[in-house]
């Protein structure tokens, strides 16, 4: 009997099993940022402990950093304290830090893949929910809490349960204007906000095979929004081509040896998932969320659902609460809804392909007078490449603000946020109440849809608007 990809990686990293507790896994990569790591380091100092493998630990500054000007001396309050503390912690414990002055600084889930830090078959952890992004490389990746961060820093291990397995097969032909963001929003809408709870999801099929690494990262990034513990995509030639010649990828001497191992990282034919979903994506339309979780999503040409279709009283109550918060009513078309802000960025959609997609829509247009729009590249290399291609000029000429790398408006933790009542077309991954700022109203869309909304001043169907 063969094994699933998930089981191959999991089993190969078990270093201790206990009948009364979850197995202990060895961790290959530990990613840090300024928000969830300070308490862990404080505890380590208090207990006079050492970092087990600083060479397998990588840190960046992303959540709290301003995106207008990135001078640490100009930052104030808790943000400055956390950034300074991260600098000290990394220096004291000899951890690689991509700080604000580093040419590779950026969002941790953008930076790590583009530097080749994440490789197929690895176990990866980070104190961030969207660590599942790295499953796009066939790496088993988990978001962890502060106490677990401390444990991994000190032991390079972590207890992890063995989750159930879910296979999601995508087949068909991707329609024009449809992006990876549309695919994953569609899937979340079908499976539900908690439909994958307790599962590791593997995405596979002909459609997955055609996607770029950046598109695969978008899909794995948002798998957490349907409750999955993490997500995986088996590595293939697309993966290998992406990783070749990256800073931390295997060098020429070790490349062929790495390929031999990576080529074993797939789910064997004679094994089964605990649950399987099959989706024909041939007729998917541009997706947009209307509520306060990513599963409350519709096609752009559909009205907001009527309350009658929600027969479960708990779900119905949740829908009513979401509609009240979002200031929307059932049976309304979102193409009739005006917006105030547009945010193109986040660890979901801030890579070069995302910016190209948005710029392709924006080119030779101006944004609406009533819209404030910003573009935030996911890393300095992304920003540099975009400027080399002239994308920054396209955005600036259209009326967008061209910002510096960071998490930015994805979460209301820095200077970029929504004011109460402001409605935003956002390429981020979460639309919970207050996620982008207290009282802010978030609609999740693809970069192309966000760009089109910026031009029109309201949501539009990009298939027919231009």
UniProtKB/Swiss-Prot annotation:
| Enzyme Commission number(s) of this protein | 4.2.1.33
Can you quote the record's cofactor note?
Answer: Binds 1 [4Fe-4S] cluster per subunit.
Reactions mediated catalytically: (2R,3S)-3-isopropylmalate = (2S)-2-isopropylmalate
Q: Which GO terms describe its molecular function?
A: 3-isopropylmalate dehydratase activity; 4 iron, 4 sulfur cluster binding; metal ion binding
NCBIfam families membership: leuC (TIGR00170), PRK05478.1 (NF004016), PRK12466.1 (NF009116)
What's this protein's family per the entry?
Answer: Belongs to the aconitase/IPM isomerase family. LeuC type 1 subfamily.
Q: What is this protein called?
A: 3-isopropylmalate dehydratase large subunit
Q: Which organism is it from?
A: Blochmanniella floridana
Q: What taxonomic classification does the UniProt entry list for its organism?
A: Bacteria, Pseudomonadati, Pseudomonadota, Gammaproteobacteria, Enterobacterales
């Amino acid at each position: 009997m063969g094994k699933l990809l998930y089981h191959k990686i999991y089993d190969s990293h078990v270093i201790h099993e206990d009948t009364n507790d979850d197995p202990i896994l060895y961790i290959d990569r530990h990613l840090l940022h300024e928000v969830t790591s300070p308490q862990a380091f404080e505890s380590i100092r208090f207990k006079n402990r050492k970092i087990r493998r600083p060479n397998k630990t990588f840190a960046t500054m992303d959540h709290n950093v301003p995106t207008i000007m990135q001078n640490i001396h100009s930052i104030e309050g808790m943000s400055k304290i956390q950034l300074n503390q991260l600098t000290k912690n990394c220096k004291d414990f000899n951890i690689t830090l991509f700080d604000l002055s580093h040419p590779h600084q950026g969002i941790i889930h953008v930076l790590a893949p583009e530097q080749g830090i994440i490789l197929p078959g690895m176990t990866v952890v980070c104190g961030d929910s969207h660590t599942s992004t790295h499953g796009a490389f066939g790496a088993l990746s988990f978001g962890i809490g502060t106490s677990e961060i401390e444990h991994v820093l000190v032991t390079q291990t972590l207890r992890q349960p063995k989750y159930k397995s879910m296979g999601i097969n995508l087949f068909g032909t991707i329609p024009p204007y449809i992006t990876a963001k549309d695919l994953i929003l569609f899937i979340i809408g079908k499976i539900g906000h908690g439909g994958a709870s307790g599962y590791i999801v593997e995405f596979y099929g002909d459609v997955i095979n055609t996607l770029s690494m950046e598109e695969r990262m978008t899909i794995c990034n948002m798998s957490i929004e349907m409750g999955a513990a993490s997500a995986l995509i088996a590595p293939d030639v697309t993966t290998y081509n992406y990783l070749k010649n990256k800073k931390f990828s295997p060098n020429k001497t070790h490349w062929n040896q790495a390929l031999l191992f990576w080529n074993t990282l797939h789910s064997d034919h004679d094994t089964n998932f605990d649950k399987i979903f099959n989706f024909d994506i041939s007729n998917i339309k541009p997706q947009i969320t209307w509520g306060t979780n990513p599963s409350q999503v519709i096609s752009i040409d559909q009205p907001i659902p009527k309350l009658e279709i929600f027969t479960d009283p708990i779900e119905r109550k949740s829908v009513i609460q979401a509609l009240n918060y979002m200031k929307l009513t059932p049976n309304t078309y979102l193409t009739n809804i005006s917006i105030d802000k547009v945010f193109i960025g986040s660890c979901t959609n801030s890579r070069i392909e995302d910016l190209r997609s948005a710029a392709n829509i924006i080119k030779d247009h101006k944004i609406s007078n009533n819209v404030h729009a910003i573009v935030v590249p996911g890393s300095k290399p992304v920003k540099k490449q975009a400027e080399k291609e002239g994308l920054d000029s396209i955005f600036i000429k259209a009326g967008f603000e061209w910002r510096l790398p960071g998490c930015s408006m994805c979460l209301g933790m820095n200077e970029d946020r929504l004011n109460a009542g402001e409605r935003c077309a956002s390429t981020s991954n979460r639309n919970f109440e207050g996620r982008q700022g207290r009282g802010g109203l978030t609609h999740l869309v693809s970069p192309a849809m966000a760009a089109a909304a910026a031009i029109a001043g309201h949501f539009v169907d990009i298939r027919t608007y231009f």
